Regions:
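A short acidic, glycine-rich active-site loop
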Residues: 106, 183-196
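A cross-taxonomic marker for long C-terminal extensions/tails that follow the last structured domain
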Residues: 193-214
Length: 214
């Protein structure tokens, strides 16, 4: 997406490496004991994994045949066809929500929230979702953003939890090393009090927080 707060801008340059489903599963089998003892499994992230729906569907389907728990980490910017092709083989979706208002989302990602919202509704009514929300002062941490986030979560009828991810500035040096201007250079990290208040507001609204938040 090229998010304004990305801490890995060094990964934006295009490159490629071909790997097969069999190769991925072979590597997973080597760690099966670890997955079984820890309750872990296969989580496919990116980039955006839904940009390769055919491969992703085959990979997840094969993993489930071998009794691995499956998950994808997506920003939700994908076609409905791609999503529906993959969902049957997913146990949980980690959904990265970059903002809860049209303005903040557009500023931070240069993409439209409306598309992401529709896809979140599509997914959230079919699969368990961990909604990962980045808390950025001045962009996603205000009262309007909080109210919109609560409204959005309440519109989902399925199993959903929210993980609040405090914005950090650890990626600034990477932007500078690449000769790029960091868009949020003057934005401070949220204080512990701001983080706690935001999480408590979600709890008071009846929203479940991810285990890491409790």
């Amino acid at each position: 997406m090229g998010c304004a707060f990305c801490h890995n801008p060094d990964t934006w340059e295009k490159g490629e490496q071909t790997i097969t489903v069999a190769e991925v599963l072979q590597e997973m089998e080597e760690y099966r004991n670890f997955y079984e003892s820890s309750g872990g499994g296969l989580t496919v992230s990116g980039g955006e994994p839904l940009m390769q729906p055919e491969f992703l569907a085959e990979l997840l389907a094969t993993a489930k045949q071998r009794d691995f728990h499956t998950a994808i980490d997506t920003c939700g910017l994908a076609s409905k066809e791609a999503i529906m092709q993959v969902l049957p083989y997913v146990d949980r979706v980690l959904f990265s929500l970059k903002g809860s208002t049209e303005v903040s989302y557009q500023v931070l990602t240069k993409a439209k929230l409306s598309v992401v919202r529709e896809n979140l509704l599509l997914i959230g009514r079919r699969k368990p979702v961990t909604l990962r929300y980045v808390l950025i002062p001045g962009y996603t941490a205000g009262k309007e953003s909080l109210a919109e986030l609560i409204r959005l979560v309440h519109s989902l009828s399925g199993d959903i939890e929210v993980e609040v991810l405090p914005y950090h500035t650890m990626g600034i040096t990477k932007w500078e090393a690449l000769g790029r201007d960091y868009p949020l250079k003057n934005v401070p990290e949220p204080t512990k009090e701001e983080i706690t208040d935001f999480r408590n507001s979600l709890r008071q609204a009846g929203i479940n927080l991810a285990a890491t938040e409790n």
